[in-house]
């Protein structure tokens, strides 16, 4: 029994060192975990607000009209949330090796949460792909900083906006 406790404490310390969770005064305060049904309202709210702000070049009605559909699809997707003090502050959605999107609450953007979510997924996948609107300059710079490379350009037929297809590959063979 004592060995189990020591082993579990050791594993938690390794996870903390990897930046997946943090300890403050002996308490776990933030973590990345799989989406739960009880998270849907918080996550869909972040999805809508982030899209409205980041994609100002797309009519608001486009995002608002897709809100309910996204709420229905979230439980069927591979989604990981970043939670701090029981509040979801961001999430990443995937379909196989394709990143559907990284979304961080407006008030906490540029605090490293998007990077933590992306690093978490990079540790699980050997390669990743995503599409990003060409007018979303901050997102493009973020992905390039994270070693994503523009592979091609295409038109998003739903919005009429040009987008880049970007790829990332791990340096390590899995």
Which role does the model predict for each range below?
Residues 69-81, 98:
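A short helix-loop-beta-strand connector motif used in the catalytic cores of GNAT acetyltransferases and
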Residues 98-109, 132-133:
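A short, internal acetyl-CoA/4′-phosphopantetheine-binding micro-motif in the GNAT/acyltransferase core
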Residues 123-135:
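Conserved GNAT acetyl-CoA-binding A-motif
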Residues 78-90:
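Conserved beta-hairpin
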Residues 110-123, 141, 145:
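Conserved acetyl-CoA-binding loop-helix of GNAT-fold acetyltransferases
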Residues 31-45:
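A short beta-loop-alpha structural element at the N-terminal edge
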Residues 45-71:
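Conserved GNAT-fold acetyl-CoA-binding loop/helix
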Residues 144-154:
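Conserved acetyl-CoA-binding loop of GNAT-fold acetyltransferases
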């Amino acid at each position: 029994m004592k060995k189990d406790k020591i082993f579990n404490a050791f594993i938690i310390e390794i996870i903390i060192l990897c930046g997946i969770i943090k300890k403050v005064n002996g308490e776990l305060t933030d973590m990345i975990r799989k989406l739960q049904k009880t998270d849907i309202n918080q996550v869909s709210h972040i999805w809508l607000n982030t899209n409205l702000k980041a994609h100002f070049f797309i009519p608001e009605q486009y995002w608002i009209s897709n809100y309910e559909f996204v709420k229905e699809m979230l439980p069927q997707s591979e989604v990981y949330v970043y939670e701090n003090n029981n509040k979801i502050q961001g999430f990443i959605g995937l379909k196989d090796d394709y990143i559907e999107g990284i979304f961080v609450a407006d008030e906490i953007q540029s605090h490293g949460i998007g990077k933590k979510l992306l690093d978490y997924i990079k540790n699980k996948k050997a390669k990743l792909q995503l599409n990003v609107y060409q007018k979303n300059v901050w997102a493009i710079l973020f992905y390039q900083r994270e070693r994503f490379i523009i592979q091609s350009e295409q038109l998003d037929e739903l919005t009429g906006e040009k987008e880049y297809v970007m790829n990332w590959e791990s340096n390590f063979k899995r």
